[in-house]
Design a protein with these regions (language model features):
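Active-site-proximal beta-strand/loop segments in catalytic clefts of secreted hydrolases
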Residues: 1, 31-34, 72
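General secondary-structure edge motif
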Residues: 1-2, 117
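Glycine/threonine-rich flexible loop motifs
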Residues: 3-12
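Short, conserved loop/turn and helix-capping segments at secondary-structure boundaries
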Residues: 11-15, 44
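Hydrophobic/aromatic ligand-binding patch that stacks against planar heteroaromatic rings
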Residues: 17-21
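Glycine-rich phosphate/pyrophosphate-binding loops
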Residues: 22-45
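Electrostatically charged, flexible surface regions
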Residues: 43-143
């Protein structure tokens, strides 16, 4: 588990599967759950959130070569007061901001050392939406 936000879409196997399906003309969606490191996944809650997303995108049109990328927020940051306490689903663009370039030398070699949650983000894009406690729904293109 983990988010596939922003530039993660270029590295993610989850997103690659949806992208490959789109290449073959299939409707597809990649779903990821951002969460704190020590937090266990609440599969019942995640299933409920995904069911809401699927109901929403079922009626939306995708152009050839498009697919959906969905990021569920950390339940600890999801706002209360929505239907069933569930977070809103917000359509947004994928954030193009690069990760911070911070590496630490260790006995095993160089390791990326930037803080994932403190990554750069643009307001209204998937990283900010998901980190703000809402479900980020992004339309992506294969090429």
């Amino acid at each position: 588990a983990g988010g596939n936000l922003g530039v993660d879409v270029h590295l993610s196997g989850t997103v690659a599967a949806a992208r490959e399906a789109a290449l073959h003309g299939r409707r597809s969606v990649a779903v990821s759950q951002y969460r704190g490191r020590s937090q266990a996944i609440d599969w019942e809650r995640a299933s409920r959130w995904v069911a809401r997303v699927l109901a929403r995108i079922d009626s939306l049109t995708l152009e050839p070569g498009e697919f959906w990328n969905v990021n569920l927020p950390d339940p600890a940051t999801a706002p209360e007061g929505h239907a069933g306490g569930d977070p809103p689903i917000i359509e947004c663009a994928v954030d193009p901001s690069p990760f911070a370039l911070l590496f630490n030398e260790t006995p095993a070699g160089w390791v990326w050392g930037a803080n994932y949650h403190e990554r750069p983000r643009r307001p209204g894009h998937d990283v900010a939406i998901c980190f703000g406690g809402s479900i980020a729904l992004s339309r992506c293109r294969v090429v």
